[in-house]
Amino acid sequence: MKKPLFALALGLTALGLAQPLPEALKKAQEAPAVVNARLEVQAKARDLDRTLKDPLRTALDELQARQALELAEARLRRALAQAENEIVAAYTQVVEARLQGRVLEKALEVAELSLKATEVRVKGGGATSLDLLEAQNRAQEARKNLDQAQRALESAQAQLANLVGPWEPEPVADLPGLPEAGLVEALLEENADLLQLRHSLALLKAQRALLDESFAARKDIDALEDQIAALATQLDGAASSLRVGLEARFRGLPPLLEGVRRAEEALEAAKKRYEAE
């Protein structure tokens, strides 16, 4: 029976060597996408600085430089959030696989003890060959389940190590609370795609403001105003669609947390049952 990874995990936890999730999340800063996004922010900040120092700059030049920096910062936040999400998912998989493995270890111990007891009963005439076959099947199934859990743990640990290096997760003691209701609006405000659309709209409006109706052709003005109206409609539609998705996910958080609590209770009940047996 394979036990080394589960036993090692227990030993590391007992020695205080398990590492908490907040420490793992710090590794997100080292993700390639985050590093590249940070370099882009630094480059756009330098571009803005040069633009502001240029005595010949126009209002449009400054607007574009500021927008470029703001968009780069939004993309950095997105890259960091995505990197953190990947770490959380991998970290959680390791914790879940380890807990499941510990339960299945107990299940195998119980199945093997039951098999030995059945073998003794068969010899004494207290059980039939069918009883023995059923006990053997239960032990075999328990062994197969534990082997699968072992492979799942190895896979989860490899995935986590690929993101943060060698890491022994510490179980999350307390579930996080629900975020504030204003989170949806904050996410909409920071969304890089919406920000890019807002920037494009602001740029078109700035270009329209620079057009002198005394000199610009009416068709050029109308064409620009049509672009502004079309982009405003596109922005409203994109924001509305994203808001619907975010609000749906926000509403799904309470039942999700409740499901986690119930799963924890079921796992604890299973552990106690196998320990009692």
Feature roles, as predicted:
Residues 9-18:
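Hydrophobic h-region of N-terminal signal peptides that target proteins for export
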Residues 30, 37, 41-48, 53-55, ...:
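Charged, solvent-exposed structural "stalk/scaffold" segments
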Residues 76-79, 141-156, 235-242:
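Amphipathic alpha-helical coiled-coil segments
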Residues 26-35, 46-63, 77-81, 85-88, ...:
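A glycine-/polar-enriched beta->alpha junction
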Residues 148-185, 221:
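Short, solvent-exposed, mixed-charge loop/turn linkers that connect secondary-structure elements
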Residues 1-4:
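Positively charged n-region of N-terminal signal peptides that target proteins for export
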Residues 119-123, 143, 150, 171-173, ...:
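Long, amphipathic, heptad-repeat alpha-helical coiled-coil stalk/linker regions
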Residues 21-22:
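Regulatory alphaC helix of protein kinase catalytic domains
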